[in-house]
């Protein structure tokens, strides 16, 4: 399988040896290239997911979705982006301007920060620390501040109610989310994201297979908790149109609203990417111990495996959104604290016992 670190090493060698640049300028140029790459990937993935969700929604509602702008409506998203870019950005009367302007950037920082930890190919990861999973959960928590400050700074009672709902929901479901990730850490013995993927290379080595029933349950709980963490249906109580207009970003227009819209879909990608990385092997191919089959699977590039698994998980989450009705706030919190939280603790105990007794792999 192709190792992307060859490309990064070649770029570094080009800057330092061929062009003769010093350490400062080499690192600066590399950081600029990485930043441009992140923003480009951010925009393209968000556009692809918006188009995908419109088509998935249309499929479940027995219609065609956008078909006018471009073939099969593929340019509809670009038209919407253009419209959003030229809209005026204004602040409502008596709003807290500092909080109002800071909030969208906090949401973007949280989504881009967690996105940077995803390894999409062997040797292709922007950030890779030995406590990677811990940092992912820590950085994602910044999004709670962005949601709450947006509602509080807008000087709108509906936005405040929405922000409080969203903050309570996101903080609650972080517990189950973290416990499911700890179960994976117990099984692999590392919190480094690249190390977790490397532990799943080999025949029948994906955690959802190697971890048996506890890993399968952890994967399912992670999907439910991740869906709630991203404020996606049926957990989209913070944006309940029939109750709160548009939720915590009611008073935002132009790219202020656009930041929240983009962050929602990138958070969906991050949740799906973490699920595929931790439980489904990430860029690791499916190997079953048959030489011919394994060699064929190894020919498929790692980024295709990663994006294929990630978009498959996203399709499942979109399916859930457009199938189930919205839950009430008491039902959402009851689901977490009475069912998912105890189940996550039981899964962690079972996983620990399986690893201690050698019943894994």
For every predicted segment, state its role.
Residues 2-361:
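Selective transmembrane helix interface/packing segments
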């Amino acid at each position: 399988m192709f190792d992307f670190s060859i490309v990064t090493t070649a770029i570094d060698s080009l800057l330092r040896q061929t062009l003769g640049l010093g350490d400062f300028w080499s690192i600066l140029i590399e950081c600029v290239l990485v930043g441009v790459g992140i923003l480009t990937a951010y925009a393209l993935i968000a556009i692809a997911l918006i188009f995908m969700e419109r088509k998935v929604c249309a499929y479940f509602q027995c219609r065609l979705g956008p078909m006018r702008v471009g073939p099969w409506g593929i340019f509809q998203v670009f038209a919407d982006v253009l419209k959003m870019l030229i809209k005026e950005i204004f602040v409502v009367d008596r709003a807290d301007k500092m909080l109002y302007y800071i909030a969208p950037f906090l949401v973007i920082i949280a989504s881009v920060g967690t996105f940077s930890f995803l390894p999409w190919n062997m040797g292709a990861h922007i950030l890779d620390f030995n406590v990677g999973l811990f940092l992912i959960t820590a950085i994602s928590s910044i999004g709670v501040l962005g949601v709450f400050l947006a509602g509080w700074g807008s000087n709108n009672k509906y936005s405040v109610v929405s922000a409080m709902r969203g903050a309570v929901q996101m903080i609650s479901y972080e517990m189950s989310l973290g416990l499911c990730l700890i179960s994976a850490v117990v099984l692999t013995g590392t919190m480094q994201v690249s190390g977790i993927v490397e532990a799943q290379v080999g025949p029948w080595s994906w955690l959802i297979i190697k971890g048996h029933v506890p890993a399968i349950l952890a994967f399912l709980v992670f999907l439910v908790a991740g869906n709630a963490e991203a404020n996606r249906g049926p957990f989209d109580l913070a944006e309940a149109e029939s109750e709160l207009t548009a939720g915590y970003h009611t008073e935002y227009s132009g790219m202020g609203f656009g930041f929240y819209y983009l962050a929602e879909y990138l958070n969906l990608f991050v949740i799906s990417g973490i699920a595929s990385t931790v439980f489904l092997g990430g860029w690791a191919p499916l190997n079953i111990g048959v030489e011919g089959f394994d060699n064929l699977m190894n020919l498929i590039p790692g980024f295709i495996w990663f994006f294929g698994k990630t978009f498959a998980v996203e399709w499942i989450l979109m399916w859930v959104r457009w199938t189930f009705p919205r839950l009430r706030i008491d039902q959402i919190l009851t689901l977490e604290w009475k069912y998912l939280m105890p189940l996550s603790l039981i899964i962690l105990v079972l996983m620990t016992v399986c690893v201690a007794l050698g019943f894994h792999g």
